[in-house]
Amino acid sequence: GLSSTIGFQLERQYTPLVRFLPIDLIYLIALGVVVGLLAELYTRYVLTMQRQGSRWFGDRLILRMTLSGVVLGCVYAALPDTFHNPSELKHLIGAGEADIGLALSSFVMLFFCTGLAAGSGAPGGLFMPMLTLGGALGLTCGTGVESLTGYVPTTYVFAGMGAFVAGCSRTPISAMFLAFALTKDLLILKPILVASLTSFVVARLFHPHSIYERQMGMELDSEERMEKQLNRHRRPFSPPTPPQSPKGDLS
């Protein structure tokens, strides 16, 4: 199924939300606002890194990838062993077994490293980092709500996943059904939809297009600039002028 394809095995650890109280609506809207703001910040950061990488290094793709690999290697070497296994890290966050310190550090680390990897020019996807970032945000916010109020919001991890995907991709309905595919529980659709729609609206206040549409726009602009440069260096072709006969020559 989809959950096994993208690396999440959460059905056994997930406890479904039996009741949906009015207080859940308030907390989920607040989560959607926070996630929507950070999703737009993440989108702009990734696009800026891609734009700057192309501007600084141009067509020197090997140099870009080498420097990014060295920096990423140094970052991961300095991190604890928990961060060396992305699958285990995603499992800890998805199952709600990570504490707030691990969730926050995971968000910061993955936020920074994903932008750096995108700036390297190497092919790679953004979907899996979105899920992990959203889950880390949801776990952090859920733990904060529990610490401050004593109320335990059981779906914040999945609500954060769906909301972050919706904020970056501008697809709240798809994010909702993605969360359903991960959990196979219909009870999660309502809280996921609330958080995803809120994140979608907040992110659209800053820019109407998704991260993928803006990436395509950057690629088209780059191709147009390259075509203009090539046309500028080309010499215009003019056909040779035939020799003119002297005016006095009547033959």
Language-model region placement:
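Alpha-helical transmembrane segments and immediately membrane-proximal extracytoplasmic
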Residues: G1-S251
